[in-house]
Amino acid sequence: MWSLFSRSQPQIKVQQLWVYPIKSCRGSQIDHSSYGEEGLDFDRQWMIVDASTHAFLTARTIPKMVLIHPVINRETNQLDITVPSPSSGSSSTYSVPLAHPSTYLPDPENDPSLDHDFVVWGCDPQDGYIVGSPELTKALSEYMGREVLLVRKGLTRRSVTDVPGVLHSEGLDPVLGFADFYSLLIASATSLDELTARIPTVASQKGFDEKRWSPSSIASQGGLEIQRFRPNIIVEGVREPFEEDGWKLIKVGKDDEIEVCFRCARCMLPSVDPATGVRDRLLPDQVMTDRVVSPVSGPKVCFGMLSAPRKKSGSIKVGDVVTVLEAYPKEAGGGYIRNEDRTN
C-alpha cells in the first residue's frame, strides 16, 4: 500500500512556518516553533464565539475576520491583537497573555471565566476561558457586528476521533486545539506555484477580471497568498506539483516525524482575500477543477495535507531538511491512491 521513498529527489526544506493564533483570523509568519500534540505553539488556541450561544464564528461566513491580526509577542509574553474599526478605518491593538489561564488564575477550575459549552463543528462542547479586557471584547463585538467573546482553549483533551465525520489514521490518536480537523497542515510551494500559473488563463476563459488576475498583477502582490489555504508548514524543493498527495510519513530536521494523514478538502475560506477580507469567486473551485481527487471528500477540491506529529513535543524551524520516509506510489494515470481511497 505504501513504500519507502527511494526515488532520486531534490532536497526538500521548510520554506515557511505559519501560525494562526485566533481561529479564522490572520496568520503570522514565524522562523521557528516548538510544537506539542496540538500542533505548533499557540496555533488556533483562541477563537471568537457568539456571546449568547458560545458557537464558534468563522471567516467562512464572516470573511472580514481575516483582517483581525493576532501577533505572538515573545518579548512581552502577550498575544497582541489588532482589531480594525468598522467606522473610522483605523485600528487598535489589545493584548492577552500567552500563558494559559490555568497557570495564573488563583483557582482556575472554578474561575468564572471558565465555561464548558463552547461549540466547534458539532463536537461535544469544549471547555475554555473567556479572556481579554472589556475594551477588547467591545472592539471585537463592534467589528463583528454582534456580541462576541474571545475564548482560550481549556485543558480538556480534544481528539480528532471526537470530530464528527473526520477520518483518522489507525494507530494514531491526534489531538488538536481549535483547528478544524488536524493539528498541522502541510503544503508545498511547488503546488502553489502551479496553481498560481493557472489563474490568468482560467480568469480569461471564465470571464473574471483579467486585470485583477493578470500575471503582472499577481506578481505585484508577491504571488497568490498562501495564507488563503492556512498551512502551518510550507515546503520547497518538491519536484512535482501535488507530489505531497502521496506522502505518508516525513521527517523534519533530525528526528521530528510527522504523519501525513489525509488530503485537505477545501471549504470556501481560500476564496477570501487575506489582504481585503473580500471573497473572490475565482478561487478555489474555478481554478482547481482537477483537484477533486479524494473519493472521501466528494466534490470538494483538495490542497494541502492534514498531518499530525508522532512525538508529543519537538521543534521545527525554517530551513529544516524534510525527508520523505514513506509514500504511496504514483499511479500510471497520474495521482496517488491512498489507503482511505481504497477502503471507502
Report the location of each language-model feature.
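Metal-cofactor-dependent catalytic cores
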Residues: 1-344
